[in-house]
């Protein structure tokens, strides 16, 4: 028996009796019995055994907090579990006494957000932090909480500045489903900023998504997209971005423009590609 366990036994068991084995009664006296779960044992820095089943200590903490079990939460925190999981677990089940007890252990409350799966809990976390709706919407984009934006769609419909900000953020963070939803449902004033962001970040998927969205709109309205395509073809050709050049040509951009600019700026990769294609066609 380790010295720390001996000390725990002397502190909690009657008559300083050190048991030879640990049944549920003894474990309960020691605070090592988790109601409805069984025995609780620390087996390493980041792991515990619950009724001999291994589980990450932070996951155990989240479960204990979601049950409102202060004793087990305190024990796991003393074993260096992450207090963020205690607050998140308590928030999920609305145990606000537990939430407020451990909330101040977290320096930046936004650090809890990656741990939250449920959109309602995500919103409660912002309410606790007295965040603005703009802050809530921004983090909803970053952490893929589309149901939050859907919930506030009518509110956002009258806030074009915020919609534009969220759209650009979704582009920068590569949240493609958010890009599609914000543009399609809320609308944005400056859609082509998507192409600028895609080129800066070398994000070919976003670049292609932009064309699939805007060309459908232009064709349905009877507009000719040639000017738009060749404008961005000039941009990506000047920069020597072959994958972007090919994608633009795929959507209808002029191959001649790409070759002309590749010659002007001596982009050998682009020139070799078209020379190889030409020789293969011959």
From Swiss-Prot:
Q: Could you tell me which Pfam families the record lists for this protein?
A: DUF249 (PF03158)
Question: Which superkingdom, per the lineage?
Answer: Viruses
Q: Does the keyword Oxidoreductase apply?
A: no
- Keywords assigned by UniProt, alphabetized: Early protein
Induction entry:
Expressed in the early phase of the viral replicative cycle.
Please verify whether the record's keywords include Magnesium: no
What does it do?
A: Plays a role in virus cell tropism, and may be required for efficient virus replication in macrophages.
Similarity section = Belongs to the asfivirus MGF 505 family.
Name of the molecule in the record: Protein MGF 505-3R
Q: Which organism is it from?
A: African swine fever virus (isolate Pig/Kenya/KEN-50/1950) (ASFV)
Lineage here is: Viruses, Varidnaviria, Bamfordvirae, Nucleocytoviricota, Pokkesviricetes
